[in-house]
Amino acid sequence: MPAFHKALLLFNPVSGAHLELRSTTMRRIAEIFQRSGVEVIAQATHARGSAGDQARAAISEGCDAVFACGGDGTVFEVLQGMAKSSAMMGVIPLGTGNVLAHDLRLTGNSERAAAQLLSFAPHRISLGRIETGGHTRFFTVAAGVGVHAELLYRANARAKQSGGHLAYYSQGARLLFRHAFVPFPVEITTSEGKAVETTALELVAMRVRSFGGPLRHWKPGSSLLSDDLRLVLLRNSNRAHMLRYTLQALTGLAPFDGLEKEDADLSFVSAKSVLCRVPEVRAAQLRVQADGELLGPAPTRIEIVPDALTLLIPPEAGWIGGPLTTQSVSL
């Protein structure tokens, strides 16, 4: 028997596949749940940013589970209405990239993923929370400051014109060799409660094991089941070193261990929080993102929030976890 009894299926009608095809897929997903005795409501999002409110409304009306059907953007929006609630959240990949679904080992086929979810179990997990630009949002995948967010900004703008995933790769190559990296001070509270101050050129706070896709082999030690953020800090702008590390990450050969060094190019830190203090004159030069969604300008505070979400995960999900340590490596 499924762990849930009344479910809301939320999907974005203007994202990915044609509306008619998407509606057909949603109907088939609903039928899979209904055959297992689940009461189902399938609902399109009303507008950009409405998914969180729709999730809250459904929970207040008796839904014990809400499923984000779509890509990373849909999951992010639904999450804002699910955080700190007691209802279960599930994800169903639908036509576009879905990093959380990949981390949960859900198949990319929407209908098969729905069938998998019937055997998933609810598990209370921690969430990341980011405060920037006067707003607070939750995330499940990653959040950060720096060139990777700039890449999202430029690639999204280019994709609107070209409509291809190659936008990300072409923009990434350009940024790697042309972008002027902006250093910013960071204040970290480690998992052990130690206060650390340093300077970074790039910061990513991860929660999932990997991003999937071309970076599926890059697993710096983060975990949905941990109560920590896994911080990845770049502290050296040597472009030859960055290119080498990028190639190593793509092939699964990137180092994640080594001796502690003050001049280390890359640091991996398990943390409870991190504050990125950016001088006002440089704030406009630094982009901020959470789960692939561009947010307001720095300064930014990122922290872990324990016991924040009931997520449907595979019944035997020990592979989601992993040891977390504080390490630095020179590239």
State each model region's role:
Residues 74-87:
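Short Gly/Thr/Asp-enriched flexible loops that form oxyanion-binding sites at enzyme active sites
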Residues 14, 27, 35-36, 45, ...:
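Catalytic core of DAGKc-family lipid kinases
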Residues 182-184, 199-201, 225-230, 270-272:
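A generic structural signal for short beta-strands and their flanking turns/coil linkers
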Residues 144, 148, 204-221, 293-294:
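Glycine-rich phosphate/pyrophosphate-binding beta-alpha loops
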Residues 20, 191-192, 223-226, 233-331:
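ATP/nucleoside-binding phosphotransfer catalytic cores, i.e., glycine-rich phosphate-binding loops
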Residues 159-169, 211-214, 219-241:
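Gly/Ser/Thr-rich active-site loops/lids in small-molecule metabolic enzymes
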Residues 1-66, 76, 111-112, 318, ...:
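ATP/NTP phosphate-donor binding region
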Residues 68-72:
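N-terminal glycine-rich "phosphate-gripper" loop used for MgATP/nucleotide binding
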